Regions:
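Structural core segment of the AMP-binding/adenylate-forming
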Residues: 2-12, 112-204
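A short N-terminal helical cap/helix-turn-helix that marks the beginning
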Residues: 5-18, 36-58, 73
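AMP-dependent adenylate-forming
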Residues: 20-28, 45-67, 223-224
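Flexible, low-complexity linker/hinge segments
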Residues: 31-40, 183-223
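Conserved AMP-binding/adenylate-forming core of the ANL superfamily
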Residues: 37-38, 47, 55-100, 104-108, ...
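Short, flexible hinge/linker loops that cap or flank conserved catalytic cores
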Residues: 51, 87, 217-221
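Surface-exposed loop/turn positions
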Residues: 57, 91, 115, 221-222
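ATP phosphate-binding P-loop of adenylate-forming
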Residues: 75, 221-226
């Protein structure tokens, strides 16, 4: 860069001064790296979102909206139900669910009950599900009442791989008209769920209690139960 006069130099200095003033209001990178925060479990962040955004939509599933308050209530009820059927610290809960509101609810409910979430791909074969369940020590699994999934889960439950199977209703997750159409035209895709142990419906699980017992979780050491 070539300066032809003192005026050019003064102009550059003026620009640098303006830039420095503008940067004064920004947080230095070194300070950003030293920000302090209080570690909390993941479900506590959900509770904070519920308290802050209660009436706002949290999930839109095929046109059916769930607000934060509703999601919070569903998580609490499901967590309380999980505790009643034996979920506590160290207990593994498998989620063999597609992308539905049930996944969000049961994920946070498991953590809030003190359990550890183990994700299963619903497209896994029966053998793959069994191998993962045994490897992870999963005896409680959450699934959807679609034959595509339940045909595999049901066989494993019959062989004693799962001690509890929590069944979620696809129809109940859909908005009114779609639920009706699903029942009329897609009924053959639904599995027949035995009304006996080890099965329990999501609705029945959530009706056991409304609030879970508090569980002490250290988010710095209890990594699997964040």
């Amino acid at each position: 860069m070539t300066f032809t006069s003192d005026k050019d130099v003064l102009g550059i200095i003026s620009q640098l001064s303006s830039l420095e003033e503008m940067m004064d209001g920004l947080l230095p990178l070194s300070a950003a790296l030293e920000l302090k925060f209080t570690p909390v479990p993941a479900y506590t962040m959900l509770d904070q979102a519920v308290a802050r955004f209660g009436s706002r939509p949290a999930i839109d599933f095929l046109g059916k909206r769930y607000h934060w308050t509703e999601i919070g209530q569903m998580v609490d009820a499901a967590a309380a139900g999980l505790q009643k059927i034996g979920v506590a610290r160290g207990v593994k809960v498998g989620l063999c669910l597609p992308n539905t509101p049930y996944f969000v609810v049961m994920y946070y409910a498991t953590l809030k009950a003190g359990g550890t979430v183990v994700n299963f791909n619903p497209l896994y074969t029966e053998r793959e599900i069994e191998n993962q369940a045994k490897d992870a020590g999963v005896e409680i699994i959450v699934s959807l009442d679609l034959a595509l999934i339940q045909d595999k889960i049901g066989k494993l439950a019959a062989r004693g791989v799962f001690k509890r199977v929590i069944m979620c209703s696809m129809e109940a997750a859909l908005p009114g008209l779609q639920a009706l159409l699903f029942r009329l035209f897609k009924a053959k895709e639904l599995a027949t769920i035995p009304n006996q142990s080890p099965y329990i419906t999501f609705a029945a699980l959530s009706a056991i209690a409304t609030k879970p017992a508090p569980v002490v979780i250290d988010p710095l050491s209890d990594v699997a139960t964040l």
